[in-house]
């Protein structure tokens, strides 16, 4: 599985071949420079110091200085280009993950935690960057150094090199033993970190509720519990890594000590020169540190590999493909029809939300919808938007089955305004044009005037170009709703869905805005879910939704006479 993951990573890296060639040349230059220093040391001792040959000493020192300069320049290019490749590659990975994630079905987002998504697109991606740098830079460099060092050790002394080689299989034992534990702990650590991100996101999205209920202490305790769980996984993983590293270093340096001991004996016997043993020890140290570096990287690789796997699952998820048979010109008179529609949420399989619902809505109609909470009012709109797909029955627009069309084509006809206005960080204007970036200034100015935005925007320093903070934190609830409605109207939809979209406005402001909306939407369809009966009294007809079906329909006056459910809703509001 790890090999497959690395192969997927390499597929991203192949786009940066020129940079990688520079990295490889730099790596080889660094390795060659370090290895050549060993032979210079041998020459320095055997031909310079041992024979008191000052010219040979000077030449050796000059060569070492030259090699250090080459080493420094090559290290600069290696570091710059490998990190450059890593940044470009992870940005592409992040883009691919984000681009695929944003095409998920709405139901799939309900199974994901926002914090987990954020963690994957930030922390996990950073781990992949570390993997690229470590694998392509340090792992390959250490491998070249290890192979070069061992080869030159054999060139200096076959006997001593054989002693060093024996230590490599010994090092593999703890690597294999600890590797499985580290891999499992790495996955748990990432999952635990995602829970922390989710908790942070949830906390600061609901900070007012936490303050209002004086719940700061409980939230701190809850966060600390999650933090301790994450810390436990990290500490255990770090202990295993540290233990492995300590064992590796002990084995490597015991081998080097043994080499020095045997080498010193060979010098005394005249089998080796002092220069040979010094260069051998130099190569042994290089090989030892390189092998130690490799084993440490291998012990660390499980965390970034787990992160890569979590990202690849997002990238590899195949989005649902949709046919696009439905063709509807905006000039056609719009109509909507539900025929015996049933629907149940996957998260609540035992609760039928829409139950054999049938209704028809023609163009140039303002339709009000009322009903008790959980009756299926909002679900009706979300089915029309293709956020979900009905279990049975048919939903038609202009007598065309919407399931035969790409949801994006359906949504071009519709503008949707939920009760909780979706406001993005930026300006008032950027939020208004979110649904129609090609809108003219005249259209924008007309809409902000109609929706009453002009009045409060004029009091701001930069008008509609004023920054409104994250999620519109600097705006009131009513101002947010006006912006959301303006965004919907600027889209020039055939169908306008209002889900308690003016609940934050007072009754007079709501009626004034509603009249403006009806004027703009002449010849089209307005469907408005209302909590206040006064919001829909002027509707052409009202649908009373109860237990997932249409319990009654008609004008306000008709329903007041003929529908017990509607009368009860009106009576409850009057009582309140």
Curated annotation (Swiss-Prot):
Principal location listed in the UniProt entry: membrane
Domain ABC transmembrane type-1 as annotated: residue spans:
20-303
Please list the residue ranges annotated as the ABC transporter domain. Answer: 336-572
Q: Which Enzyme Commission number(s) are on file for it?
A: 7.-.-.-
A GO cellular component entry from the record: plasma membrane
Mark the transmembrane ranges: 21-41, 61-81, 135-155, 158-178, 242-262, 277-297
Entry's Gene Ontology molecular function annotations: ABC-type oligopeptide transporter activity; ATP binding; ATP hydrolysis activity
Q: Is Translocase found in the keyword set?
A: yes
Membrane topology classification: Multi-pass membrane protein
Top class in the EC scheme: translocase
Protein location: Cell inner membrane
Q: Where does ATP bind?
A: 371-378
Alphabetized UniProt keyword annotations: ATP-binding, Cell inner membrane, Cell membrane, Membrane, Nucleotide-binding, Translocase, Transmembrane, Transmembrane helix, Transport
UniProt xrefs under SUPFAM superfamilies: ABC transporter transmembrane region, P-loop containing nucleoside triphosphate hydrolases
Return the domain comment text from this UniProt entry: The ATP-binding domain (NBD) and the transmembrane domain (TMD) are fused.
Q: How does it assemble?
A: Homodimer.
The protein's name in its UniProt record: Putative export ATP-binding/permease protein RF_0214
Instruction: List the taxonomic lineage.
Output: Bacteria, Pseudomonadati, Pseudomonadota, Alphaproteobacteria, Rickettsiales
């Amino acid at each position: 599985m790890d090999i497959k993951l690395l192969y997927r990573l390499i597929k991203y890296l192949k786009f940066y071949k020129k940079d990688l060639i520079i990295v490889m040349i730099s790596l080889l230059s660094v390795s060659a420079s370090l290895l050549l220093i060993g032979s210079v040391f041998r020459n320095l001792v055997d031909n310079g110091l041992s024979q008191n040959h000052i010219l040979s000493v000077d030449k050796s020192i000059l060569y070492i200085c030259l090699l250090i300069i080459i080493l420094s320049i090559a290290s600069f290019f290696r570091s710059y280009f490998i990190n450059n490749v890593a940044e470009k590659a992870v940005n592409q990975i992040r883009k691919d993950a984000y681009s695929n994630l944003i095409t998920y079905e709405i139901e799939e987002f309900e199974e994901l935690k926002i914090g987990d998504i954020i963690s994957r697109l930030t922390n996990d991606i950073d781990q992949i960057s570390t993997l690229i740098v470590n694998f392509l830079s340090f792992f390959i460099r250490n491998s070249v150094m290890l192979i070069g060092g061992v080869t030159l050790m054999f060139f200096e002394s076959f006997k001593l090199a054989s002693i060093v080689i024996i230590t490599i299989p010994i090092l593999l034992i703890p690597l294999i033993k600890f590797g499985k534990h580290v891999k499992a702990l790495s996955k748990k650590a990432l999952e635990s970190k995602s829970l922390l991100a989710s908790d942070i996101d949830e906390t600061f999205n609901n900070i007012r509720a936490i303050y209002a209920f004086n719940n700061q202490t409980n939230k701190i305790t809850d966060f600390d519990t999650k933090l301790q769980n994450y810390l436990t996984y990290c500490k255990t993983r770090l202990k295993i890594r540290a233990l492995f590293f300590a064992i590796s270093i002990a084995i490597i340096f015991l081998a080097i000590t043994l080499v020095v001991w045997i080498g010193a004996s060979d010098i005394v016997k005249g089998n080796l020169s002092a220069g040979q043993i010094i260069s051998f020890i130099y190569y042994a140290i290089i090989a030892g540190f390189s092998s130690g570096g490799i084993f440490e990287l291998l012990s660390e690789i499980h965390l970034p590999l787990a992160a890569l796997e979590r990202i690849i699952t997002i990238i590899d998820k195949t989005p649902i493909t949709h046919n696009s048979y439905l063709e509807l010109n905006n000039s056609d008179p719009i109509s909507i029809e539900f025929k015996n529609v049933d629907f149940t949420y996957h998260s609540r399989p035992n609760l039928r939300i829409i139950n054999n619902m049938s209704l028809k809505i023609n163009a140039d109609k303002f339709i009000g919808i009322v009903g008790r909470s959980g009756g299926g009012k909002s679900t009706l709109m979300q089915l029309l938007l293709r956020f979900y797909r009905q279990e049975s029955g048919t939903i038609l627009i202009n007598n065309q089955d919407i399931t035969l069309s790409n949801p994006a084509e359906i949504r071009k006809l519709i503008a949707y305004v939920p009760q909780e206005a979706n406001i993005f960080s930026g300006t008032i204007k950027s939020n208004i044009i979110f649904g129609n970036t090609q809108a003219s200034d005249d259209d924008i100015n007309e809409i902000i005037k109609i929706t009453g935005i002009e009045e409060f925007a004029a009091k701001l320093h930069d008008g509609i170009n004023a920054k409104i903070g994250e999620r519109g934190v600097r705006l009131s609830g009513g101002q947010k709703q006006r912006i959301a409605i303006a965004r919907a109207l600027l889209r020039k939809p055939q169908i306008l869905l209002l889900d308690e979209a003016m609940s934050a406005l007072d009754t007079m402001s709501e009626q004034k805005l509603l009249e403006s909306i009806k004027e703009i939407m002449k010849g089209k369809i307005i469907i408005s879910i209302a909590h206040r009966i006064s919001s829909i009294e002027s509707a052409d007809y009202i649908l009373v939704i109860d237990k997932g079906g249409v319990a009654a329909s008609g004008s306000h006056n008709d329903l007041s006479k003929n529908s017990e459910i509607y009368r009860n809703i009106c009576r409850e509001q009057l009582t309140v």
